């Protein structure tokens, strides 16, 4: 949510800032702005809508300067408008801000009493005025910056410039991610490494409560008490070209088709004969999980659905009681924590606000250890967890998660095998069989992609539909939830996922001849039960779309469309049956003409609570 880019250089920085914003569009936003300093003057341009609107405005008006900040805004305080867009200016200062200042109304009243006037409805304008207020009483802008930040409550990632000091860029982080990019004779700040890949591969990750001061020749990082800190430099191996669409129409389409390779990357170097390398999970040894007797998984959105699938595998393969909870709910109940409990978080970005807050809460509770399943090395979740299992999905730009989800599932299966082996709950024969099945996964994923053309044609039947029901049983119930989420978030068709056994407990009342019902029906031990649910739907005249294994024998009639999918090992079914549901959502969105990669009101990384 929101994006920040800042630069201090010996060249014009406006194109660097605009390119950085373009690379952050996937995070979700409703307006954008840029501010540079030229001849001790603040040049500020703001627009609503897409970054391309800002680029056109900059091209028309010009925005010179060798130092500047830029921002994409997601409305929290105040409607989307040019007035509310960032940067916000107070006299000589310009500020961009990600996060929420919780006590802004109280501070605003105090500043109004001091004679400050406000143009916008935002908490960010209040913050820049607060910094300006402290500057009048401080010996330096750095001191004023620290004083203001010690006064505010909430979360923030900030970048600040001063027209009276056109060679220095200030930044601070508390709850909202910020990274520093190191160049030669130039330095940068951003909310995501992707924004800076065209200009640097060397990064410093700011931690909670840290302030950075950047010039062309130096970077200094302080805590809020003013103590200078030593920071490690991290070299990124990500390729700037890896985030191009290539021959694909949308990032989502590309990322769906990348799944065979992404799954292969998740396995790379981790399978050794019938064993999984201990190096798969960073930080563990052969005894790490021996005493674990309960597992708590916490995640949001699609990652939560991955956790629900993971529970089936963890309990079946390890015998350990596993609970899964939405992060924003976990934080607000008094959890009963057993002595030898493992706390597991799942997040693609590693910056999801509620998931991070849950991890920090867990550290105050009685958990033995914490483990994160994450796609981004160096993210806050990775740095703050005891152990990490990297999904290695590669950059995912589309807001709707695809390859990140399937690699999360594979990572959870791998984790279950590692814990099961340490606990002695998996026989050698079972371990061998599962690992042999896992080796087939990338090739099977490619086979499942071969149904794309059929699903593209099928999706035309969803045109004009306003509601849809997804049904699944057992481990496929979370996949039904995920299928419904994908459809609703990118095609804007209202969709709900239900456990098929719950059909008679409410959702059957909604079924009529106009409602598509999607059934996830792999050939497994629950097929007979699922067939009964299918017949109940059929009897009420609904439009049935059944995603089924080739070897399963289900009848097809005028109201039923069957999509036959390749046979696959039962333990891999949740991963593989996800792929056709992703394709269905994608093609429905294309037909409906929605913004597939940046659906309305959604953000890739939810970094505010």
Question: Residue locations for each model-derived region?
Answer:
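Conserved short alpha-helical segments that host acidic/polar catalytic motifs at enzyme active sites
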Residues: 1-245, 249, 264-293, 332, ...
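Glycine-rich oxoanion-binding loops at beta->alpha junctions
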Residues: 49, 66-83, 274-286, 310-346, ...
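Glycine-rich phosphate-binding loops that contact phosphosugars or nucleotide phosphates
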Residues: 290-440, 520-525, 529-566, 584
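Generic C-terminus detector
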Residues: 226, 558, 568-609
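Acidic/histidine-rich
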Residues: 152-186, 463-489, 524, 531
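Short, glycine-/Ser/Thr-/acidic-enriched flexible segments
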Residues: 9-13, 39-41, 49-50, 74-76, ...
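Active-site phosphate/pyrophosphate-binding segments
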Residues: 259-263, 267-296, 377, 387-516, ...
